[in-house]
Regions:
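Compact, glycine-rich, soluble single-domain proteins
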Residues: 1-76
């Protein structure tokens, strides 16, 4: 596994989704939400304990668990 994950982004930073490294269930759920390769994603907020994080993609905010964010890899 190489590259930076969504969890590594700083607040307000944007990046492009490169690939998702997770089980079928996670991948299908994220794909259904429009979280696909080539989509720009921005880190909007981090919950007080670091979980979940709030991201914005395709114009809407989405809460993603920390463990899932670590499986979404980015091209920066």
């Amino acid at each position: 596994v190489d590259g930076m994950s969504l969890y590594d982004l700083n607040l307000g930073e944007k990046a492009i989704i490169k690939y998702i490294n997770g089980d079928d269930k996670l991948t299908k759920r994220l794909l259904a939400l429009g979280c696909i390769e080539g989509t720009e994603i921005e880190l909007k907020r981090i919950a007080p304990l670091g979980d979940p994080i709030i991201v914005n993609l395709r114009g809407f905010d989405l809460a993603i668990r920390k463990k899932d964010a670590k499986n979404i890899f980015l091209a920066v």
